[in-house]
Regions:
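Hydrophobic transmembrane alpha-helices
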Residues: 2-77, 81-82, 86, 102
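Membrane-embedded alpha-helical hairpins and interfacial helices in multi-pass inner-membrane proteins
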Residues: 4, 52-66, 99-107, 124-237
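Residue-level recognition of pore/gate-forming positions within transmembrane alpha-helices
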Residues: 44-48, 90-91, 113, 142-143
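Alpha-helical transmembrane segments of multipass membrane proteins
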Residues: 48-52, 72-73, 92-96, 118-122, ...
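Alpha-helical transmembrane segments of multi-pass membrane proteins
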Residues: 68, 72, 110-117, 177, ...
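Interfacial segments of multi-pass membrane proteins
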Residues: 78-79, 90-98
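Hydrophobic alpha-helical membrane segments of integral membrane proteins
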Residues: 84-89, 108, 133
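Hydrophobic transmembrane alpha-helices of multi-pass, membrane-embedded glycosylation machinery
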Residues: 88, 92, 186-187
């Protein structure tokens, strides 16, 4: 186990995985930090507000939301223990800001939001960030939460076959992955230095991009566009 001579040195350490006693202590420390709590509350409100807006492509075929960008930043700052209640708060506020859903408030979406925030925190909190890591985090959320769990919730609420929601959700979420990862990279590279000056994330956090990341992103982008076009043509033939 590595020992740190000063508290400052401990506050700047990054972790390869969250499975460390020091990682847990650092995350728990955020529960007592006024600065972190205030920033988390502010980003919760911003995330919920942005969540009610979206871009629509191809009629009702594809909706592009941007709240995941704020959610990732929030979890990068707050850590896993704050991220879970933050996810619940964001879902509740989003429901209220949007004027409610005709089907009423559904707790399944609150669970999805809490799990999504936890995943982002495990990937981003006190970690060395890269395009591959951003892509992996978004892939995990898209597949496990948006596709698998989301299809269950839609089946419960609207009654159509699970496989119908699963197939359409999988195609849309996988096709959007390269774009979403690129947006995260562009935004976070601009905002990380600002957050460091605000002292809400360690100064040692950085975002690196290697040549293989560009190659991987290009391939993923081509596949995503091809899948999206093929599905759109199939649905409108």
């Amino acid at each position: 186990m590595k020992h740190f001579s000063t508290e400052t040195e401990k506050d700047t350490v990054l972790f390869k995985t969250p499975f460390s006693p020091l990682y847990v202590r650092c995350a728990l420390k955020n529960l007592k930090s006024t600065r972190i709590l205030c920033m988390t509350a502010l980003l919760c409100a911003l995330c919920a507000l942005i969540d009610i807006f979206y871009l629509m492509i191809g009629g009702a075929f594809l909706r592009i939301y941007f709240s995941f960008l704020v959610a990732g930043l929030l979890c990068m700052i707050s850590g896993p223990f704050l991220a879970i209640p933050a996810g619940f708060l964001v879902d509740t506020l989003s429901f209220l800001f949007s004027g409610g859903d005709p089907a009423g408030y559904f707790p399944g979406y609150a669970l999805s939001s809490m799990l999504s925030f936890l995943i982002y925190a495990l990937f981003f909190y006190r970690a060395k960030l890269s395009l591959s890591r951003l892509f992996a985090a978004r892939l995990t959320v898209n597949v496990l939460i948006n596709v698998i769990l989301g299809s269950v919730w839609k089946h419960i609420l609207y009654g159509n076959a699970y496989i119908v929601y699963f197939i359409s959700g999988a195609i849309k979420n996988i096709a959007m992955l390269p774009i979403e990862a690129a947006l995260m990279l562009i935004l976070y590279r601009r905002l990380v230095p600002i957050l460091q000056r605000m002292r809400v994330i360690p100064g040692s956090v950085e975002i690196t991009v290697q040549r293989r990341d560009y190659v991987f992103s290009a391939i993923a982008g081509v596949i995503g566009v091809a899948v999206l076009i093929a599905y759109y043509v199939y649905k409108n033939r």
